[in-house]
């Protein structure tokens, strides 16, 4: 008759215990919980920086249009501005706007609102506005940010507040 140690000798396999696997999963979960908000903030900040760059281009082109024509380009005068903005032209709201994945851009003229460039952040469905970035006639060097409704995430609210406080990112 064989003793117990002889029977189990061929089962001497090196492996992780269930506790060790649970500890690894827990550590990965904690790291993901810490890293995900930072990643989301970096992505949204990158989107906002890109929008600010395009917004400044629209404002500069609109100011050049003003010098040549004595008035700012309105919502229907997008083609008159001497700039290329990547995206598709959207005329569904009246006038011309450039729609990208994340923003809708337009020169708005200096009418009642006093904007010379406007970028509206939209969620993926593109229907509602989350926040808008704009440049006004009164202070063309400063970027302004205004939240729209309750759709903005906490990250978007913080970044918008930062832009509003500093005038840029």
What are these regions (language model features)?
Residues 28-30, 54-56, 95:
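Alpha-helical interaction segments
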Residues 15, 26, 46-49, 54, ...:
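Generic hydrophobic/packing signal
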Residues 33, 37, 41-81:
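Conserved hydrophobic/amphipathic alpha-helical signal-anchor segments
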Residues 11-43:
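N-terminal single-pass transmembrane signal-anchor helix
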Residues 1-11:
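N-terminal secretory signal peptides that target proteins for export/translocation
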Residues 67-169:
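Periplasmic/extracellular, small/polar-rich flexible segments of pilin-like filament-forming proteins
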């Amino acid at each position: 008759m064989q003793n117990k140690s002889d029977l189990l000798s061929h089962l001497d396999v090196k492996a992780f215990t269930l506790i060790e696997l649970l500890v690894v999963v827990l550590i990965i979960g904690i790291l993901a919980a810490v890293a995900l908000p930072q990643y989301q903030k970096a992505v949204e900040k990158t989107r906002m920086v890109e929008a600010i760059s395009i917004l400044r281009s629209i404002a500069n082109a609109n100011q050049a249009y003003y010098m040549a024509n004595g008035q700012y380009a309105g919502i229907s005068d997008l083609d008159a501005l001497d700039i290329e903005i990547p995206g598709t032209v959207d005329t569904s709201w009246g006038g011309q706007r450039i729609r990208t994945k994340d923003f809708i851009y337009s020169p708005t003229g200096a009418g009642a609102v006093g904007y010379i460039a406007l970028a509206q952040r939209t969620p993926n469905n593109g229907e509602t506005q989350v926040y808008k970035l704009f440049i006004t006639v009164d202070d063309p060097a400063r970027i302004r940010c205004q939240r729209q409704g309750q759709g903005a995430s906490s990250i978007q609210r913080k970044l918008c507040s930062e832009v509003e406080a500093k005038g840029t990112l």
